[in-house]
Amino acid sequence: MITVTKEKNCITVKGHAGYDEYGRDIVCSAVSVLTYNLQESINRLTDDTVGFCYAPGEAVISFGDVSAAAKLLIDSFIVGIEMMSFSYPGNVELTKH
């Protein structure tokens, strides 16, 4: 199960989807693409400084006050994760605090 936790100044992505074997897991791939796209979009399209920390099975995205553009990108990431959790409820879980 991949758990995505959205807090005021942090998003944590943890775990493995377990949808298919390693290298063939489309759910894991989709969440990874959403996460990497968020990082690159904020870096390329805004002047905001956002922290990204990656480790095997975990990504932590930390931010303070961000521009409207970065907030929109973060909100778009959350929409993508919500869609994944609706389509694959046994593999992706979103929690908002």
Regions found by a protein language model. Name each.
Residues 29:
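DNA-recognition element of transcription regulators
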Residues 1-26, 35-97:
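N-terminal intrinsically disordered, cationic/polar leader segments
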